[in-house]
């Protein structure tokens, strides 16, 4: 992996200002999986222990629908640089207005406002999707994500202590929630 110079960072930041958020297409899925797999070794974002494949995750991708539980990508200059998806929180009818969201950003574009833009879009468009409550499940040691959700009006609604075992370390899972 090459280092990012300050000149490279400026050009990436300029590109970030021109983000388009759109529905994900199957064509985007290999890039979506690459972004996801890059987080696996960090042990900060996902409970997956090994990278996954497009084939293994395609059924999950196909469960989304643009009108209720969309899957969006953030695109800049024709390149997918991040994504956000809505999932059913629980399968019971009374939870119909609650969605769990996940957001992932290409490692070269992190800390440049991509996740914030995706989350703001989710908050803003949630009601038109029939969503009244958004929940994010975030590892308690993932402080950057917790701070971002906090800045966007999410509150810590719960903590599941020691629920995930990553490399022989038990990790807590924070439940962040917000009405929209």
Regions found by a protein language model. Name each.
Residues 18, 99, 162-180:
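C-terminal "cap" of GNAT-fold acetyltransferases
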Residues 88, 135-138, 150, 155-172:
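Conserved catalytic-core motifs of GNAT/GCN5-like acyltransferases
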Residues 126-138:
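Conserved GNAT acetyl-CoA-binding A-motif
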Residues 33-60:
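Conserved GNAT-fold acetyl-CoA-binding loop/helix
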Residues 110, 136-146:
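Conserved beta-strand-loop-alpha-helix junction that forms the acyl-donor binding cleft
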